[in-house]
Amino acid sequence: MAPKIFIDGEHGTTGLQIRTRMAGRRDVELLSIPEAERRNAAMREDMLNSADIAILCLPDDASKEAVQMVSANNNVRVIDTSTAFRVNPGWAYGFAEMDGAQADKIKAARFVANPGCYPTGAIGLIRPLRAAGILPDGYPVTVNAVSGYTGGGKQMIAQMENPDHPDAITAPHFLYGLPLTHKHVPEMTVHGLLDRAPIFSPSVGKFAQGMIVQVPLHLDDLAEGTTMESIHAALTAHYAGQDIVTVVPLADSKALARVNAVELEGKDTMKLFVFGTPGGSQVNLVALLDNLGKGASGAAVQNMDLMLAS
């Protein structure tokens, strides 16, 4: 019998993308609430408890409510795509390539917290350098990022695409999170193995899907003897043996005139780059991904597949 999967919030941006990725699969059975019954709390609870894996694509409070509904049913495993549980030690963090043991933790977990889009890029760049002893304690990490507007869900999609929307956004690019208290900062700090919260400056561009995350570093403030080449080598070693996260060779990065935020649109992979001048004193680490791919729905399906393989 095929495992039953219920996407709670299947009509939202992330939920719809998950359904698209699972279309045509015969190895799982998708449970679904008829659209006319979407507000039926009893039916929702029944669906949650009938699933082998429930994928929650909900706001934080609604996710917490859903987890309570299945807390006594050990037959139900959960993948949550909100920020509610990402730094909860009782939940496996759903970034399988984060370190060598993470995929096995996800396979064995009952509860998996799907990573945020920005943290996927930031942690993907930072954690290997912390693990290798290159990025020292106390380093003032800065993360700058731009996302496609679908990361803001249906409301922002309407604001960006409908010029008649009462709160339409006409700017081609805008900063937000200006008080430096973005909800992804704790996640970056904990899973990036940082002892000091990074300064995070997010922004949105007038493109639907895609993301660039940047972490600039001063080499003189890193471990003694660190070079652009040694940083690249540490990243390459960290991600060896898998094909989801790739580290672009230095020669290929050097040949680039620009990085295109939408290059990986529709894909569930991530590319990492190390930019700088050989022998120079600075580097810029860059992660490229689809905010709805490896940054959300693609990661959720990847985590589901790992859990089903356990």
Swiss-Prot record:
GO terms for molecular function: N-acetyl-gamma-glutamyl-phosphate reductase activity; NAD binding. Its main location: cytoplasm. It is found in: Cytoplasm. Its EC number is 1.2.1.38. It catalyses: N-acetyl-L-glutamate 5-semialdehyde + phosphate + NADP(+) = N-acetyl-L-glutamyl 5-phosphate + NADPH + H(+). GO terms for cellular component: cytoplasm. GO terms for biological process: L-arginine biosynthetic process. InterPro entries: AGPR_AS, AGPR_type-2, NAD(P)-bd_dom_sf, NAGSA_dehydrogenase, Semialdehyde_DH_NAD-bd. This is N-acetyl-gamma-glutamyl-phosphate reductase.
